[in-house]
């Protein structure tokens, strides 16, 4: 069994050693340009087109993250990047759900307790208590009800918040009001005071966080984008903040990463930036899951995390 690995930022030595330990029957190597030797499985993140092209004998392509949009974007730009008929698999949880819960809860509480406003008041040396928000009339909406969206919804519900979610198809989450489909999106947004985006990045969801959507939220709402930068129309966010339609935004993802130094988000007093760290891939847990899925494929079983390429997740 031959496995090729490519990630521009991960420690390749750590991954090769970890995978070899878990799959001693496998020959694991870091892919380099010009490497066209046989491979049964590919572990990738934003792979160059030539890495997977003409590898029709692959048994599986593993995305080294929860999202597969980078691979599918490559396929749209360079057809053949993803060999036809080869299953594409993504990581499911591997510690990401807990990280996402922690991140979302931290910033929900920051806005709910108005700590962001107190920080601005401190900079102005102004001592002024603010009226607190009340959970009874502080509705949180979550776009996306997959593994991460569901996990965040459950955490916030357990904290006593009124939570609703929206997804492409109906989902059932205990204690959470569910909306589905384009026909229910406006009803989902109505009255939401804090919106969290955890949608998959697909052509259908690109640019969904725009002025039209913001107008449906409660005046002075908050936005937390934890999915992909492509979901957000950045100029529309700046306009919504300027007009007071949105009170503040926390952004972990951006159209261009790293965020250019001249970007206005850096200096905006009501925009909080983190460098795409809301839920990072934990190597040991990820290797455990990938190894288990490879063994499942070798045994003719259905592995976890198989992606519907047409849907994009």
From Swiss-Prot:
Key word Acyltransferase present: no
Function of the molecule: Catalyzes the NADPH-dependent reduction of glyoxylate and hydroxypyruvate into glycolate and glycerate, respectively.
One Pfam family, short name: 2-Hacid_dh_C
Organism, scientific name: Serratia proteamaculans (strain 568)
GO (cellular component) term, any one: cytoplasm
Alphabetic keyword roster: Cytoplasm, NAD, NADP, Oxidoreductase
Catalytic reactions on record: glycolate + NADP(+) = glyoxylate + NADPH + H(+); (R)-glycerate + NAD(+) = 3-hydroxypyruvate + NADH + H(+); (R)-glycerate + NADP(+) = 3-hydroxypyruvate + NADPH + H(+)
NCBIfam families per record: PRK15469.1
Coiled coil: none
Family annotation (Gene3D superfamilies): NAD(P)-binding Rossmann-like Domain
PROSITE patterns referenced in this protein's UniProt entry, alphabetically: D_2_HYDROXYACID_DH_3 (PS00671)
Transmembrane regions: none
GO terms for MF: glyoxylate reductase (NADPH) activity; hydroxypyruvate reductase (NADH) activity; hydroxypyruvate reductase (NADPH) activity; NAD binding
Keyword NADP: yes
This protein's encoding gene: ghrA
UniProt-annotated catalytic positions: 228, 276 (proton donor)
PANTHER family the record matches: 2-HACID_DH_C DOMAIN-CONTAINING PROTEIN, D-ISOMER SPECIFIC 2-HYDROXYACID DEHYDROGENASE NAD-BINDING DOMAIN-CONTAINING PROTEIN
Catalytic activity, EC: 1.1.1.79, 1.1.1.81
Cellular compartments annotated: Cytoplasm
Name of the protein in its database record: Glyoxylate/hydroxypyruvate reductase A
């Amino acid at each position: 069994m031959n496995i090729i690995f490519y990630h521009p930022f991960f420690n390749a030595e750590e991954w090769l050693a970890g995978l070899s330990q878990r799959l001693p029957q496998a020959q694991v190597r870091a892919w380099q340009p010009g490497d066209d030797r046989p491979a049964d499985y590919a572990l990738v993140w934003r792979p160059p087109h030539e890495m997977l092209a003409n590898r029709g004998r692959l048994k599986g392509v593993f995305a080294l993250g929860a999202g597969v949009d980078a691979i599918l974007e490559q396929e749209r730009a360079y057809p053949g990047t993803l060999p036809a008929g080869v299953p594409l698999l993504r990581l499911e949880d591997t510690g990401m759900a807990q990280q996402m819960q922690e991140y979302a809860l931290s910033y929900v509480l920051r806005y709910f307790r108005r700590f962001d406003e107190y920080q601005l008041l401190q900079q102005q040396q102004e001592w002024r208590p603010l009226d607190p928000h009340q959970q009874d009339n502080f509705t949180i909406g979550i776009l996306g009800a997959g593994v991460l969206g569901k996990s965040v919804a459950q955490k916030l519900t357990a904290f006593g918040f009124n939570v609703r979610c929206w997804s492409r198809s109906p989902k059932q989450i205990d204690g959470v009001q569910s909306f589905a489909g384009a026909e229910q999106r406006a009803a989902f947004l109505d009255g939401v005071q804090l919106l969290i985006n955890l949608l998959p990045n697909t052509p259908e969801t690109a640019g969904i966080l725009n002025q039209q959507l913001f107008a449906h939220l409660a005046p002075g709402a908050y936005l937390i984008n934890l999915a992909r930068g492509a979901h957000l129309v950045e100029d529309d966010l700046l306009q919504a903040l300027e007009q007071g339609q949105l009170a503040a935004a926390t952004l972990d993802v951006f159209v261009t990463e790293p965020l250019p130094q001249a970007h206005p988000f850096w200096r905006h007093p009501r925009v909080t930036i983190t460098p795409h760290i809301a839920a990072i891939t934990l190597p040991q847990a990820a290797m455990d899951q990938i190894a288990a899925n490879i063994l499942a494929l070798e045994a003719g079983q259905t592995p976890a995390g198989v992606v519907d390429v047409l849907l994009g997740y």
